[in-house]
Amino acid sequence: MSHYETLIRDNLGSAFADGAEALAERLPGRQGPEGLTFPAFGASCALTPQDVRLGGERETGPRGLVVSLYAATASPEFLLLEPLVAFRDLPDSMPYQGAFAANAERPLVPRASEIPARRSRILEDLGGDEMDAPEGTPGDLSLLVFPLPKIALCYIVYLPDDEFPASVTCLFSSNARTFMPLDGLADTAEYTTRRILEIMSEAST
């Protein structure tokens, strides 16, 4: 068993400690023959006390770890979207800010000009097609997505023009820390960004 698998199994043990019904309410998720199901990173996710499955495939790597961590720490509270929070404004985030920008924001910058044409597809895939970004959100466009049921990310995109290069900023829903520790939030944003890039690559082929 790999290190990731050990951590995933430990997190799932904590997640299911109070029973599947209590966990289903916290996630929230549905109980079914495959386990507890809910959307995660644009795929159908199924949890059992033994494993995490994304899109029907057993996930034993970093994404599986993030999902298991969410399951282990999610609170019964409701998601509060506003005010959106920058990663740098989260407590104790200073040592991780460089890595966050490198992994969650900068990878989208070279393809910022493609985002408007792919926006609907991205929102549909990541559960952002039912809610708009908060009124007054800056940028040329924004993407409000839900990589996990109670964690929202808002990507603010500035398109390149004659004076300024493109830029992308990723913000979190107001109480995201209620449902995930800091390192898990950084990883959530990273893997959401990777999924957005995958969607754009799929759409261009």
Annotate each predicted stretch with a short phrase.
Residues 59-83, 173-205:
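Ampiphathic alpha-helical segments that act as solvent-exposed interaction surfaces
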Residues 88, 147, 152, 156-157, ...:
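Short flexible/disordered coil segments
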Residues 119-134, 181-190:
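Short secondary-structure transition/capping segments
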Residues 1-34, 64, 70-130:
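Short Lys/Arg-enriched alpha/beta "domain-start" segment
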Residues 43-67, 158-183:
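Intrinsically disordered, low-complexity regulatory segments enriched in Ser/Thr/Pro
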Residues 104, 108-109, 137-138, 177-181, ...:
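Domain-length accessory/inserted modules outside core catalytic folds
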